[in-house]
């Protein structure tokens, strides 16, 4: 079994790089993401379903967004870093309208979310022997105060705190979570209660939670108001949605 692939940060370069060994759960997470347009993605109703959605701001076409997602899937499977992915999308003329800093943000957010989902799956599989999670912030000059306030929080894997505060907790968030055994949690000190700090606006969800049912319900509600023929065609899309585990 492949365990944990590393997601590393070079703080002085503000870069994300992933190791070449594929982390299977992260790959599967990326493949399950669904294409939505930017105005849908940033709708307030999407807060709890954003983990299963993928979009790219400033790119309006579904086919264009799909090309970006496909390229990111390949990058995660191969362990490509940002520079390699950027060169590939340039060669394939994908996302050419986006400046470099936007491309890096797209890459970083997608990779972080995929690995967060993969780690969540791993933590759930092993919570009998490692029943606690510890929040870790980088704690340098670029760490947001709200993120730093969560540093060192140690709570059970299934504590409600992790449903809204599992990293990434904002754009370019460098925070991580690590699993602990009972002995390790005892040494670190289990938190009596969750801190009052909150993630950045729009990031209050756990990327690893399966929200397929909620997303399907939301889209069905939208489809219900469409004309007959369009409604029938749109309904067929639901057959492609993954079911809950």
Ranges and model annotations:
Residues 1-170, 179-245:
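Domain-core detector
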